[in-house]
Amino acid sequence: MAVKIRLKRMGSKRSPFYRIVVADSRSPRDGRFIETVGTYNPVLSPAEVKINEELALKWLQNGAKPSDTVRNLFSSQGILEKFHNAKNSK
């Protein structure tokens, strides 16, 4: 089972709100997911990003592939840097 970390769209029309979820790559965008890792609200002037770092690092270490947008969010929060440092220190 290929696992991805991606955005699940919530909110109403023209007012998007996203949950960052871990899901099977074959499931639909807003379909079934395994676990919620955080949230992303692009509507606010500085976009609000809340991520549970421990869960994100756990899933990255287990082989989950982040989508392009989630990769950008993780790198802006410093999570990818921590992941690469932990991976290279082994």
Curated annotation (Swiss-Prot):
It holds the Pfam family Ribosomal_S16. This is Small ribosomal subunit protein bS16. Keywords: Ribonucleoprotein, Ribosomal protein. GO terms for molecular function: structural constituent of ribosome. The keyword Ribonucleoprotein applies. It comes from the Bacteria. Gene3D superfamilies: 3.30.1320.10.
